[in-house]
């Protein structure tokens, strides 16, 4: 959808260069454009199956259409402007094969624009804990066991867009296990035109709703985790950050100008 030709070619070629070769490459164009169709047609690889929507369906509906089309055991998610390193599929497939209890595996990744490496928590317990606070799996780098989605009747939901991936993960918290490979196998193109940047406020609003949903639906698990989370709040007076409140479980501290402790409590904060 509205993809830069250079980015699209780099994305396609990164998939065709995978060392693991037994896959079908499903490409769906949500807003068909003749120039993009010509780009895709220029790759004479029988694994490519190109389809296009007759009208714009949006991210969630398009992803669900691809899930229903897919014939494979695993679904390797991928966006139109990112890059999968050659060993990504091989290593994610190997992990899922060796760990049948795991429904989703992702990996460490590098942000191309910032030139920074991001490593999320690795094991299921750590990922689940973080999922209540923020998304702990990079979606376009993830590989999903299709049977988990089918058996639980799970799909992406448009009402959570553009955070539909985070919502899907949160609905899977008590249904399967997650894992992040520590190796960088993916390059994420975090540029001004991608969905996260274009819909930032909507993303933040949906994220808050998803977190509340996850905490309510996993109340017992969240209760144990909440006691260990450290919250930091700054209070400004006439635009100056004067007070800093640090809370963790039953304990709270209030600092003046981030240095002087002016209040400590095991139960609450009073200013």
Question: In which residue ranges do the predicted regions lie?
Answer:
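Acidic donor-binding segment of Leloir-type glycosyltransferases
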Residues: 12-55
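Glycine-rich, basic loop-to-helix element that forms the pyrophosphate-binding segment
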Residues: 36, 53-70, 91
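Conserved nucleotide-sugar donor-binding catalytic segment
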Residues: 68, 125-204
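Short aromatic/hydrophobic "clamp" motif used to bind/position activated sugar donors
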Residues: 75
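The conserved acidic donor/metal-binding loop of glycosyltransferases
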Residues: 79-83, 108
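Conserved donor NDP-sugar-binding/catalytic core segment of glycosyltransferases
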Residues: 87-118
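C-terminal, non-catalytic tails of nucleotide-sugar-dependent glycosyltransferases
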Residues: 143, 193, 200-232
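Boundary detector for helix-to-coil junctions that initiate low-complexity/charged tails
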Residues: 218-271
């Amino acid at each position: 959808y509205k993809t830069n030709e250079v980015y699209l070619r780099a994305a396609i070629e990164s998939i065709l260069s995978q060392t693991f070769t037994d896959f079908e490459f499903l490409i769906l164009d949500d807003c068909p454009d003749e120039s993009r169709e010509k780009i895709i047609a220029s790759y004479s690889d029988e694994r490519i199956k190109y389809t296009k929507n007759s009208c714009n369906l949006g991210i969630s509906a398009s992803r669900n259409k691809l899930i229903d089309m897919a014939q494979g055991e695993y679904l390797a998610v991928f966006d139109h402007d990112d890059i999968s390193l050659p060993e990504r599929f091989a290593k994610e497939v190997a992990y899922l094969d060796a760990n049948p209890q795991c429904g989703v595996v992702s990996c460490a990744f590098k942000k191309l624009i910032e030139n920074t490496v991001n490593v999320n928590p690795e094991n299921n317990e750590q990922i689940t804990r973080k999922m209540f606070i923020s998304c702990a799996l990079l979606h376009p780098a993830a590989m999903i066991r299709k049977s988990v989605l089918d058996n639980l009747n799970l799909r992406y939901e448009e009402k959570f867009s553009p955070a539909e991936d985070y919502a899907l993960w949160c609905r899977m918290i008590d249904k399967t296990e997650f894992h992040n490979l520590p190796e960088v196998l993916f390059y994420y193109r975090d540029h001004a035109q991608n969905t996260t940047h274009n819909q930032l406020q909507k993303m933040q609003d949906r994220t808050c709703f998803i977190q509340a949903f996850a905490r309510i639906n996993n109340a017992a698990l969240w209760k144990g985790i909440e006691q260990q989370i450290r919250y930091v709040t700054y209070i400004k007076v006439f635009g100056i950050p004067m007070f800093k409140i640090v809370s963790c479980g039953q304990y709270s501290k209030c600092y003046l100008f981030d240095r002087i402790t002016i209040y400590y409590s095991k139960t609450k904060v009073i200013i």
